[in-house]
């Protein structure tokens, strides 16, 4: 009896709260559009507009659009319209202020579904039955409760696993350029990613049941979206993938919310459903250009190359939503893809991204032109969290030494190659010729591998040792004597 009473009481309180909220914040509708500027709509005579409030716009033809308040000045409000402003008539457009921020419905049922850039299903399936409605800006994670990423993810790609190991919970972008196979590399990582399986040690890896991919596309062409969708379907992982697609012909402004919707879904899957989520964001250059468009429409003071001065802060609000949290088994690993305009790594987008993220994977056009796949240049690539994710107990005790030595030999080989172009091969010393041989074999045997070739980290390390045996022991100065004694002999099997 007490139970029904409390339920009735709760119901009564709920009705009172709703009516009280409605009295204090009625959902007012305005017809006071004073101007349209690019993606922005300016409204006058608005009663108490709130920053970041969601506005529903009803056009003269009956279609609905949504927007967000960007700026408030007295009774004036500047609204950013996500679906674009084409067709908005200043006299006949109704604007309703909802009094709420932008929230997105989240549920475990989002896996296996395809959404547009605004989070609406576009796969002819039913609407999402929401378990919760979450703010798309996400909850800030207390730095004290973050866990340092220490479990290495094996991608099956030698250039990444040995030289630039990725840890679970890391954010590491792929720096690429137009026409390079960054999509193929990202798809291969999605197909092959898993924890390192150490021989003789049973690793309980719930990779199959507990792994999810959230893929957000911003301003990509139809071909790229089809490529990823088809790849996920072919390898049978589509039921563990959630896709958000903002294509090149979709509104530019929608690109600003697409990565945030994707990351909100990823946070729910990671921290509520305790899944290990891999988030692929492509293309961050399109996102930054959308940011520049809004900034220009608001007539803000531009920074480098016309991008807004707050672009660093804005990118950080996306990239920092990766990691692991104490008391939760899930994790978010981020691999944003960005295409460098004119192959320029000093461009503001890759430049600022490199400051925020924990390293980068650099896709090189010269390697690609020589038919090398994956064309990952290991010299400018970096993984800042590699040191804590490798070594004895995690991969193998020779891992960091082999990585350092391969890096050093490849760098010297590049210098020798440049010198050979000037002085000719006859003027080179025997040591120089060894470095040249190493350079060729490193690119041919170590970096080059098939699209579906999944090498374990141990196979990759063994290939590294085969290459290092080109040199006499005395020239391998980066490897301690104890490691050399164990691994350098040709008959050593590990």
Curated annotation (Swiss-Prot):
UniProt GO molecular function: ATP binding; proton-transporting ATPase activity, rotational mechanism
InterPro entries in the record: ATP-synt_VA_C, ATPase_a/bsu_AS, ATPase_F1/V1/A1_a/bsu_N, ATPase_F1/V1/A1_a/bsu_nucl-bd, ATPase_V1-cplx_bsu, P-loop_NTPase, V-ATPase_su_B/beta
One Pfam family here: ATP-synt_ab_N
Keyword list, A-Z: ATP-binding, Hydrogen ion transport, Ion transport, Nucleotide-binding, Transport
Domain of life: Eukaryota
NCBIfam families: PRK04196.1 (NF003235), V-ATPase_V1_B (TIGR01040)
Family: Belongs to the ATPase alpha/beta chains family.
UniProt-listed HAMAP family: ATP_synth_B_arch
Protein name: V-type proton ATPase subunit B
Protein's organism: Manduca sexta (Tobacco hawkmoth)
Gene from which the chain derives: VHA55
């Amino acid at each position: 009896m007490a139970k029904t009473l409390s339920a009735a009481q709760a119901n009564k309180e709920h009705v009172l709260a709703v009516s009280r909220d409605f009295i204090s914040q009625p959902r007012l509708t305005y017809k006071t559009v004073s101007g349209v500027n690019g993606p922005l709509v300016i409204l006058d005579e608005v009663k108490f507009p709130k920053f970041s409030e969601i506005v529903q716009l009803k056009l003269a033809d009956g279609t609905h659009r949504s927007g967000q308040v960007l700026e408030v000045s007295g009774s004036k409000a500047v609204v950013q319209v996500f679906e674009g402003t084409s067709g908005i008539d200043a006299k006949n457009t109704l604007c309703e202020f909802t009094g709420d921020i932008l929230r997105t419905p989240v549920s475990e049922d989002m896996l296996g579904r395809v959404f547009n850039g605004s989070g609406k299903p576009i796969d002819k399936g039913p609407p999402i039955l929401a378990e919760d409605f979450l703010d798309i800006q996400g909850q800030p994670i207390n730095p004290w409760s973050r866990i340092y990423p220490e479990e290495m993810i094996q991608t099956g790609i030698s250039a990444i696993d040995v030289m630039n190991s990725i840890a679970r919970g890391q954010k590491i972008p792929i720096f690429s350029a137009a026409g390079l196979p960054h999509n193929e590399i990202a798809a291969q990582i999605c197909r092959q990613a898993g924890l390192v399986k150490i021989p003789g040690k049973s690793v309980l890896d719930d990779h199959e049941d507990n792994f999810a991919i959230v893929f957000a596309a911003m301003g990509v062409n139809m071909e790229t979206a089809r490529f990823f969708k088809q790849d996920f379907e072919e390898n049978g992982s589509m039921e563990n993938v959630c896709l958000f697609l903002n294509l090149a012909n979709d509104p530019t402004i929608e690109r600003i919310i697409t990565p945030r919707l994707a990351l909100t879904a990823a946070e729910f899957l990671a921290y509520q459903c305790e899944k290990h989520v891999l988030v692929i964001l492509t293309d961050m250059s399109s996102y930054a250009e959308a940011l520049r468009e809004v900034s220009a429409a608001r007539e803000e003071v531009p920074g480098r190359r016309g991008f807004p001065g707050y672009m660093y802060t804005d990118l950080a609000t996306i990239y920092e939503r990766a990691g692991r949290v104490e008391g939760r088994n899930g994790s978010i690993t981020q691999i944003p893809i960005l295409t460098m305009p004119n192959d320029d790594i000093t461009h503001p987008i890759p430049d600022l991204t490199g400051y925020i993220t924990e390293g980068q994977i650099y896709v090189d056009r010269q390697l690609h032109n020589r038919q090398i796949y994956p064309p990952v240049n290991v010299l400018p690539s970096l993984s800042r969290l590699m040191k804590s994710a490798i070594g004895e107990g995690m991969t193998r005790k020779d891992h960091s030494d082999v990585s350092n030595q391969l890096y050093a030999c490849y760098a010297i080989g590049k210098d020798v190659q440049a010198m050979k172009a000037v002085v000719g091969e006859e003027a080179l010393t025997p040591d120089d010729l060894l470095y040249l041989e190493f350079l060729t074999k490193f690119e041919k045997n170590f970096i080059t591998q098939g699209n579906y070739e999944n090498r374990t980290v141990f196979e990759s390390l063994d290939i590294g040792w085969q290459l290092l045996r080109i040199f006499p022991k005395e020239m391998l100065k980066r490897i301690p004597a104890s490691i050399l004694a164990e691994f350098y002999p040709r008959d050593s099997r590990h």
